[in-house]
Amino acid sequence: MPLNIQNIIIIINSSLIIILFSSIFFFQLT
């Protein structure tokens, strides 16, 4: 169970980082 929760947290974290970087890239383009 804890492993599953950690996996979910890691996935959410990675997706958040990707969104952050994409937003920064978008703002730099404009």
Curated annotation (Swiss-Prot):
Family affiliation: Belongs to the complex I subunit 5 family.
Topological type in the membrane: Multi-pass membrane protein
Superkingdom of source: Eukaryota
Catalyses which reaction(s): a ubiquinone + NADH + 5 H(+)(in) = a ubiquinol + NAD(+) + 4 H(+)(out)
Transmembrane segments: 7-27
Species classification: Eukaryota, Metazoa, Echinodermata, Eleutherozoa, Asterozoa
Keywords: Electron transport, Membrane, Mitochondrion, Mitochondrion inner membrane, NAD, Respiratory chain, Translocase, Transmembrane, Transmembrane helix, Transport, Ubiquinone
GO CC annotation, single: mitochondrial inner membrane
Enzyme Commission number(s): 7.1.1.2
Compartment list: Mitochondrion inner membrane
Entry function: Core subunit of the mitochondrial membrane respiratory chain NADH dehydrogenase (Complex I) that is believed to belong to the minimal assembly required for catalysis. Complex I functions in the transfer of electrons from NADH to the respiratory chain. The immediate electron acceptor for the enzyme is believed to be ubiquinone.
Name recorded for this polypeptide: NADH-ubiquinone oxidoreductase chain 5
Molecular-function GO terms, alphabetical: NADH dehydrogenase (ubiquinone) activity
